[in-house]
Amino acid sequence: MKTLDKEEFRIKLEEINKLVQKKDYKGAMGIVDSIDWRRVKNVRTLCVVGEIYAANKRYEDSKEIFLLAYHRAPIGKNILYRLIEVSLRMKDIQEAEEFYEEFLEIAPNDSTRYILNYKISKEKQVPLDQQIRILEEYKEKEFTERWSYELAKLYYQNGDTEKCLDLCNEMVLWFSEGKYVMKALDLKNRMGMLTGAEKEKYDKQFIPNLTTVEEAAELNTDKDSQEISEIEKA
């Protein structure tokens, strides 16, 4: 691993960023491995590298880079969040809990602490009642689609269909559309509690988006007009 001058490093960094934008994390990792990141001080760059390693399931390398970033960041709560997630991916619950304690010291009032606590508790396989209480506390602070659905799913798994149904209805009312609303409708469907309009919306996702005869004719007309225009220009 040779030492790069500033220009070589800049070029490689541009290549990495382009590959990340294309979500080609495997290709980006090929470049990342050729650089000694211990010499890099830019926290944002280090975080990108940490994410690349995590995307390639190289969690030990990801953790090492995130630790470098954490020690160079003035306030590192977001980096601690990722360190906790990476530690959990590595099944290192003890280390995740140590990072979580650091997170609480830095950001004791940040509502994200509930999500981190939930992720750790889930990995530890604590009883569902405890997991539910954590997400209920979070819901009192923040009402978000993803974690509301997660809570509804826990209610369902715990056999509390009434609370599951109430929360699913609340999600549909507040958010109306989106991935997690469809997941909430799926839970309602399993319980046989979809309304007529909800069933129509739920079933629609399984129907291919086919082009009608009229739309196809219109597309062909537009294409013919474009070809004629190009011929006239020539």
Predicted features along the sequence, with ranges:
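Short solvent-exposed coil/turn linkers within tandem alpha-helical repeat scaffolds
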Residues: 37-40, 73, 141, 174-181
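TPR-repeat structural position
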Residues: 25, 59, 93, 127-128, ...
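TPR-adjacent "capping" and linker segments in tetratricopeptide-repeat scaffold/adaptor proteins
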Residues: 1-10, 34-41, 136-140
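Intrinsically disordered, low-complexity, charge-biased linker/tail regions
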Residues: 1-30, 75-85, 98-120, 177-234
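Register position in tetratricopeptide repeats
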Residues: 21, 55, 89, 123-124, ...
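Alpha-helical adaptor scaffolds
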Residues: 47-54, 67-68, 75-143
